[in-house]
Amino acid sequence: MCEVTVVIPNYNGQKYLLPCLRALYESSNVEMHVIVVDNGSEDQSITDAKELFPQVNYILLDRNYGFCRAVNVGIRTADTEYVLLLNNDTEVCVGFVEKLLRRIKRNPLIFSVEAKMLQYGNHELIDSAGTYYNALGWAFARGKDASVRKYNRQCRTFAACAGAAIYRKAVFEEIGYFDEKHFAYLEDIDIGYRARIYGYINLYEPKAQVVHVGSAASGSRYNEFKTRYSVRNNIYLIYKNMPVWQIVLNLPFLMIGFFIKALFFWKKGLGSVYLKSLKDGFAICDAGNKVIYDRSRLKNYLRIQAELWINVARRLS
């Protein structure tokens, strides 16, 4: 019986999709369904993939709707208990799917499990060993640029990087799917935050490893596209998931965090993009879907708040 569906979003990924699929099939000994959701690519990535991997279910969208719409289509199409999201610019290591599947099955409260991501240019360096968010309004990857020999213990994380993580499908029906107003960036923090509010947990599994190119769709680590959506979505994420009392409590930290980021992006030549994106973030809050505050979940909010403060120290250490 198949328990897991792998969903791979694709947009003009001719350089990456074939190696991604090849590594997935060569490194896995578990029965799985694979869905590639294409965001209206203009290259030959899907044509090439269909020729070499006809067993894959290809869903072709008419244009680029963004990461969130693509993975939502894939998740809804899946008929398995678990869904594994995988970026097209990744190459999984041996046993990747099995190790994530084994971990998430251990506890029904586990919503997601993130893999250990290694840098494509140097497999000896970590790309991400857990996804975190803090009271400064900063999302960050734990262990970035550290040796692959570090961060070898399984642990809880704030959220799971959706580029290489397995999810319990039934929970999406309870907390909602990826918010398509995000288009791309911070959507994984948002859904991980929501899961935490509802009392679920997110884990990091170091035994499951994947090589990640990073920024394959946007072109570089810091660019106008990535800055625009990540900054805009951060405002929306805060508004959506934090009740008023939590926003007020974190406001001094958030103001400091936004100011530091403004200086950072100004030095990168993206200062005006950053400021405009802040305004855009406030604009989409009105049309957004704020999580309804439920006092019965106060303990969950307090746990989240404690972690937001702890993660400031984690980020600055």
Map each language-model feature to its residues:
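Conserved donor NDP-sugar-binding/catalytic core segment of glycosyltransferases
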Residues: T90-Y133
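A conserved acidic beta->alpha catalytic loop
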Residues: A23, D38-T47, R63
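Glycine-rich, basic loop-to-helix element that forms the pyrophosphate-binding segment
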Residues: L61-A78, N88, K99
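Short aromatic/hydrophobic "clamp" motif used to bind/position activated sugar donors
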Residues: V83
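A short, conserved alpha-helix in the catalytic core of glycosyltransferases
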Residues: F158-Q209
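A recurrent flexible, glycine/aromatic-enriched loop bordering the glycosyltransferase active site
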Residues: L125-I126, W138-F140, A146-Y167, A184, ...
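Non-catalytic, C-terminal membrane-associated alpha-helical segments of glycosyltransferases
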Residues: I247-S317
